[in-house]
């Protein structure tokens, strides 16, 4: 992971360490948003990974979607599937 991506990952790691145990398991997606964010930063770097993580977090709300949503590029079968 690049140094900038490591800096972007700090708030995610802090959330997982400090807030997640108190908030509980409320993520609508699998993998969870924090796992998704760390994986996106690892695979795609700070800019694209940060953008993917921000989009995912903005989609995670009661009126948003749910279900299996891996990081693009992580699952070739997922990348070929049409979105709709």
UniProtKB/Swiss-Prot annotation:
InterPro entries: Membr_insert_effic_factor_YidD
Main location: membrane
Top-level taxon in the UniProt lineage: Bacteria
GO cellular component, one term: plasma membrane
Cellular compartments annotated: Cell inner membrane
Keyword RNA-binding annotated: no
Compositionally biased tracts (Basic and acidic residues): 75-84
Stored Pfam families: YidD (PF01809)
Keywords, ordered alphabetically: Cell inner membrane, Cell membrane, Membrane
Region (Disordered): 63-84
Membrane topology: Peripheral membrane protein
Role according to the record: Could be involved in insertion of integral membrane proteins into the membrane.
PANTHER family per UniProt: MEMBRANE PROTEIN INSERTION EFFICIENCY FACTOR-RELATED (PTHR33383:SF1)
Family: Belongs to the UPF0161 family.
Entry protein name: Putative membrane protein insertion efficiency factor
């Amino acid at each position: 992971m690049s140094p900038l991506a490591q800096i972007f990952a700090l708030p995610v790691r802090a959330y997982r360490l400090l807030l997640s145990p108190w908030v509980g398991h409320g993520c609508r997606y699998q993998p969870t948003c924090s796992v998704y964010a760390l994986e996106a930063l690892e695979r795609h770097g700070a800019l694209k990974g940060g953008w993917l993580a921000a989009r995912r977090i903005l989609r995670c709300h009661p009126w948003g979607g749910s279900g299996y949503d891996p990081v693009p590029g992580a699952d070739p079968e997922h990348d070929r599937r049409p979105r709709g």
